[in-house]
Design a protein with these regions (language model features):
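N-terminal subdomain of lithium-sensitive/metallo-dependent phosphomonoesterases centered on the IMPase/IPPase/PAP
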Residues: 1-91, 246, 251-252
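Residue-level signal for inorganic ion chemistry
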Residues: 22, 26-29, 50, 61, ...
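A structural micro-motif
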Residues: 35, 68, 136, 178-179, ...
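Solvent-exposed alpha-helices and their adjacent loops that cap or buttress functional pockets
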Residues: 38, 78-80, 113, 131, ...
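Generic detector of well-ordered alpha-helical packing
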Residues: 51, 74, 90-93, 124, ...
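DPxDG-like acidic metal-binding loop motif
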Residues: 80-136
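A structural micro-motif at secondary-structure boundaries
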Residues: 140-144
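An extended, acidic
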Residues: 147-256
Length: 256
């Protein structure tokens, strides 16, 4: 099996810096009474801050990495001429953002021929971030980030954006087994897993830009990321991040 090469440290540093700046731009609008919000056809809120942050990131990425593609939530994809693409979600957790809840995040990832090479989760309202580069480890403000070693469902903190879309009575089974279930979801839930504060994060329905950073962040932190069918992909429409020991057991319960 071919081992993918480490990503360039400078590329990771630029990604972290750009996403922090994009996060600062969203903070200017956070909890403002005059926050401008549009709605998509499905009712999902799109604050003006979302569009502003995506536009900023696209402009900066085009300047620093010409030819790289971009996949974002709010604008059409930019094709790649380099074999690389950036995947971004300027505000992950728009409902939290528009309600003044500080658990929203900014997400940025770089994908190359070997898979996701760079991943950043920025939590601007909390003053936290988690980032990783392939072969460079996973990091937070507190230093190296590692998943927990909790190996039993009993006592495991399991996050989810929603338990309503879990199959059957899975949530009830886990609750009866002693798991601690919390809906601290979106990028925040993944950050909790990567830093050892939660054992798992379950996302029943996602788009690629919702989970772009997660494969490299979880891998470099010592955990695992797959979709709910068990594939190591951000294209599967779902996501499961764990500390590793609980992954197969949760997959068996959650597999569609």
């Amino acid at each position: 099996m071919t081992i993918a090469p480490p990503v360039d440290q400078a590329t990771l540093d630029v990604a972290v810096a750009l996403l922090r700046e994009a996060g600062d731009r969203t903070l200017r609008w956070f909890r403002r009474d005059d926050l401008e919000v549009h709605r998509k056809a499905d009712g999902t809120p799109v604050p003006a801050a979302d569009r502003d942050a995506e536009r900023f990131l696209r402009e900066q990425l085009a300047e620093r990495f010409p030819g790289d593609g971009v996949l974002g939530e709010e604008e059409s994809p930019t094709p790649s001429t380099t074999g690389r693409r950036w995947i971004l979600d300027p505000i992950d957790g728009t409902k939290a953002f528009t309600c003044g809840v500080p658990l929203y995040s900014n997400l940025l990832a770089l994908e190359d021929e070997h898979g996701i090479a760079v991943g950043v989760i920025n939590l601007p309202a909390l003053g936290e971030a988690v980032w990783a580069g392939r072969g460079l480890g996973c990091w937070s403000e507190r230093g190296p980030a590692r998943v927990s070693d909790h190996a039993e469902v009993a006592g495991a903190f399991i996050m989810s954006s929603s338990f309503m879309r879990w199959p059957g009575d899975t949530a009830l089974q886990l609750d009866r087994s002693g798991a601690v279930l919390r809906t601290w979801g979106d990028g925040y839930g993944y950050a909790l897993v990567a830093t050892g504060r939660a054992a798992a994060m379950v996302d029943p329905v996602v788009e690629p830009y919702d989970v772009g950073p997660m494969p490299v962040i979880l891998a470099e932190a010592g955990g695992r990321f797959t979709d709910l069918a068990g594939a190591e992909s951000i294209e599967g429409g779902s996501g499961l991040a764990t500390n590793g020991p609980l992954h197969d057991e949760l997959l068996a319960l959650l597999r569609p």
